[in-house]
Amino acid sequence: VPQTLTKSPGLAHARFSWRLRKGLTDRAITLLIEHSRSKKKLGQPEKWAKQRQIMVRELMGRKKYRQAYSLASTHHLDKGAQFATLEWLSGFIALRRLKQPDLAIRHFTKLKNTVETPISLGRAGYWLGRAHSASGDKASAKIAYTFAAQHQSSFYGLLAAEKVGIRFDKTLAGREQFPNWVNASFTKKSVFSASLLLLTAEQPDLAERFLTHLSESLDPNALGQLGTLLAELRDPHLQVMVGKRAAQHGNIIAAPYYALHPLINTPHPVAAELMLAIARRESEFNPTLVSGAGARGLMQILPGTAKETAKEIKIKYNVKRLLTDWKYNATIGGAYLAKLSRRFGGNPVLIAAAYNAGPSRAKAWIKKQGDPRKKSVDVIDWIEMIPYAETRNYIMRVTESLPIYRARLGRQVLPVSFSKELTGAGLLPLSQ
């Protein structure tokens, strides 16, 4: 290597990546810490950010919290998803592991001032409230929690509302009335006309692209009108996709965002809100979806799991029907959920963890981190310490959907507080 390039950030990153590939994790961490002393030494901080998160989690798993904080907080980013994640990690470690709430407040404040989506705003406000509370500043904690509680479509927004006694947001029941969509201004746009032509031509995937693009330019009232149209078309998948795109731009229109699916018209062995929450998260109600891992259909059932479950409930197994018959898929998915519910005592956190990552991993996390159903274990910390980002996110998205779907179904929204639901046994099979 030429002398002029020995201090190149690009060369350092290549060395870092090589060490990781060779399993030299400690040496990779040492190199990352050394180059995190300045933005100049990193060159392009964003290139290091994803592996930085992984290394921080690695150190947290080893209980090397000071080193983990140092690595998380010296990211030298100023915006974006990686910035938000690393600022949150810095604040979490400072608050929950180093017991330094004032330090945590700095990170959670930066997070709150940077993020935009309801999920992230709820998260930032809740943790800022926790940090202020730990520092003894009850007034500031209440302000932060109240801010987060504006976003009750999110996991942390629900928890924050509970902290300050704010009632469930009734708009999430999805009963808002909007003017007739026929007279909506967006019906005159070419992108809308194209989407209808594509739906008529049985090209729903292409129609989805046009409709989600259209939704980005609509105000909440027009989004509600578009949601009403999609409900009339009886396409819950398109409803969810438009609802999610709107949410990414800060607009929560509950009816499409938490669309109902006709699966609720058929009896299942578990609560309807659990079926809806899982199906929405798994496939976004797309009955023909096949994942990279081979999971199929509405409930994203793996063929092996489906075959075993079909045998247990004494129905004929047909792998093709997992994609061609959503009712068949839901029957098997519901039976599998009931099995997980019995295994994990009706606890929504463990059911979701097991459905996403497998029951053996859920049991392993109980063994390593404690049982989240017990008072001695902080269930929020338990979720946040799961090593897989996908599973952490999955648990939050499923559990936050439960009270909202109960509201959509006209049922009692919170039979117990949301925090108690997370540790409780409220989702036992209906036969029990």
Locations of regions flagged by a protein language model:
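Alpha-helical segment of the N-proximal tetratricopeptide repeat
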Residues: 14-22, 54-62, 189-206, 210-213
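Outer-membrane beta-barrel initiation region
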Residues: 154-169, 177-204, 208-209
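Catalytic glycan-binding domains that act on GlcNAc-containing polysaccharides
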Residues: 27, 39-48, 55, 62-88, ...
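Residue at a conserved register position within TPR or TPR-like alpha-solenoid repeats
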Residues: 19, 59, 94-95, 132, ...
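TPR repeat positional signature
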Residues: 12-15, 52, 87, 125, ...
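Solenoidal tandem-repeat scaffolds enriched in leucines and small polar residues
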Residues: 1-48, 54
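TPR-adjacent "capping" and linker segments in tetratricopeptide-repeat scaffold/adaptor proteins
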Residues: 2-7, 40-50, 79-80, 176-189
